Amino acid sequence: MTERNIYSVSAEIAGRTLTLEAGRFAEQADGAVVARYGDTMLLATVVCAKEAREGTDFFPLTVDYEEKMYAVGKIPGNFFKREGRPTTTAILISRLTDRPLRPLFPKGFYNEVQVIITTFSIDMENDPGPLAIIAASAALCISDIPFAGPVGAVQMGHLNGQLVVNPKMNEIADSRLDLVVAGTKDAVLMVEAGAYELTEDEMLQAVIDGHAVCKQICDLQEQLVQLCGKPKRPFTPPVVDTSLEEAISAWMGDRLRKAVRSPIKQEREAQTEALKAEVIAHFTADEPEEEIANRTKEVTKAFEKLLKDEVRNAILDEGIRVDGRALDEIRPISIEVGVIPRVHGSAVFTRGQTQVLTITTLGSPGDEQKVDDLGIETSKRYIHHYNFPPFSTGEVRRIGTPRRRDIGHGALAERSLYAVLPDEKDFPYTIRLVSEVLSSNGSSSMASVCGSSLSLMDAGVPIKAPVAGVAMGLITGEDGRWRVLTDIQGLEDALGDMDFKVAGTAKGVTGLQMDIKTTGITYEIMREAFAQARAGRLFILDKMNEVISAPRPELSIYAPRIMTIQIPVDKIGALIGPGGKTIRNICETTGAQIDIEDDGRVFITTPDGAAARQAISMIEGLTREAKVGDIFLGKVVSIKPFGAFVNILPGKDGMVHVSELDEKRVENVEDVVSLGDEINVMVIDIDRTTGKISLSRRAVLTGETPEERKAAGAAPRPRPREEQRGGRDEPRSLRDELRGPRREGDRPRPRRRDD
């Protein structure tokens, strides 16, 4: 057996040990690293194809984060008892890992690269997201794959007014910030964050502090490379035929400039495609038939390079964008609310040629989404789904399950609004938002944020403040010049160097996502992007407030009504009943949906108030505890010479002594009440030892309160002894008279076996 060489490096990060190890596992992968932080342990493997895929003109990188149930000591609960399709969390971590790695591969490198991250152990304290980025970067660095890493990643929180590095998972719930930053030693590559209205300065400081820790993690990866790194495989970037570009540029003259400066996307694309077809036809006309295909690719690539240069140079040199806007100008905005009948809330937000319809649906607490990530069962009362159909960009594409992009954009919009949602105790509804992108020319995710805020207010959801979002772009030049663009459209996104999305209220930032296509950006660029984004966000909020500035005072007539009551925890079983029989009966009788929390809160969801009141009455009847001074409409269930027994609650009787039946003296109980009568009675005493209840009809008739009775010296009559009830209903003296005198020598007869 060949002895393995195992290499390991460690460093203290935020009081916990980060360890990177290579050589123990997956020796046939091009690179494999186990990253451990606390007891969270991940294996990252990377494999690169030996040759570029034929006909590929893009970099085919795939990142898969594989959740394994054994990592938390669980067996999958499905029929096959094995892991299935990736969860939303797995997809989001895959995207989180992909984004900072992709810019660091060389341009023109078209070999397929696959990164697989497998969860070995999850300790429920240390978030595996940043660790996945670190593990993947380390595996790429020690491999022979061309990669300009390493990349460090860290999570930042904001607790007790202080920034915290790598807060534990249970601390995130109390943190005003959940931010992941990734970068090289020289620059920031990626930021993803949700926040509770932090200022731009606070957000930037979190990025700066996080990047400082990223540098330490990069140093650790470099130590591992020195121990076991492989020489990088040779790669020569494709040679650019500048002479062909010059020839095409000269032949087109200013036609390309005129084509790309059309403000309408469809017209711009049509003119650009027509010009490209002319260029291809002209520059392939003299080629032999067998060379036409290759020549067409070369001409197409040269044309697209000229198109990119035209757009970028116009911005850098002239400050002119393709649609004629200034660098900090936002496209025309139009807003409508309440556009869809019968739904609980709706809004259409249109910015330029990007249009998003967002629908709000309110449901009961039982409609919460059950989430089971690696055995951690939680529920979500707020859900946001983002749909990007092919017609939104004028394309034909198969419609199937949501793509990773759709899930990622929905998650960004979801976390951008989370900070302004009402507390569950004030608004117990489950909230589902669906953003339908009807037309897209860039920044559809931020349009979803705006549409969602408007739709929530239209639905009457008491959000704390309106939220708007805007996407910023960046154009850089080889001479160090750069320009930040506000509200980028599709072409600027595709040909630019950065996508910097910021969402928030007038007070502060609630959501942030930054992706770049270069090898990093500086703090100065980020500071400028934050400043322009704030100005743009406030402008959009003003436009939104012109249409609807606060939540509607009432919910839609089509929305369900939820009422909340509190019952004693020890009464939950009584409400549910054997096998759920009792609660099912209430639901069937009233048409209500009833959800019970472990702390005794009961949510009654009904289509109207009458059904809710009926359900509450039935629940209170089952769970209410009698108290001194309470008045009940009770039913007489038993009559005795000394008084009447009255049922006041299900399974709960009290006794009205003959002296408490009326204001005047009562000689015979049946002169006042009969079996089955319903009478109003007041609880005047509850025996602390036995729990037996004494009732008074007289107190109700006279209007006396327990305090007045006590002050007047009235005391509850002593209850009869136990043997006077049950099987021996008659008083002892009456029983003795009926039985007659006992004869001497009488003894109880022993029971026979067949009695």
Swiss-Prot record:
The gene is pnp. Residues 719-755 have a biased composition (Basic and acidic residues). One of its GO terms (cellular component) is cytosol. Residues 699-755 are annotated as: Disordered. Pfam families: KH_1, PNPase, RNase_PH, RNase_PH_C, S1. Belongs to the polyribonucleotide nucleotidyltransferase family. It is found in: Cytoplasm. Mg(2+) binds at residues 493, 499. Its cofactor is Mg(2+). Involved in mRNA degradation. Catalyzes the phosphorolysis of single-stranded polyribonucleotides processively in the 3'- to 5'-direction. GO terms for biological process: mRNA catabolic process; RNA catabolic process; RNA processing. Its main location: cytoplasm. Its EC number is 2.7.7.8. InterPro entries: ExoRNase_PH_dom1, ExoRNase_PH_dom2, ExoRNase_PH_dom2_sf, KH_dom, KH_dom_type_1, KH_dom_type_1_sf, NA-bd_OB-fold, PNPase. HAMAP family: PNPase. Keywords: Cytoplasm, Magnesium, Metal-binding, Nucleotidyltransferase, RNA-binding, Transferase. SMART domains: KH, S1. This is Polyribonucleotide nucleotidyltransferase.
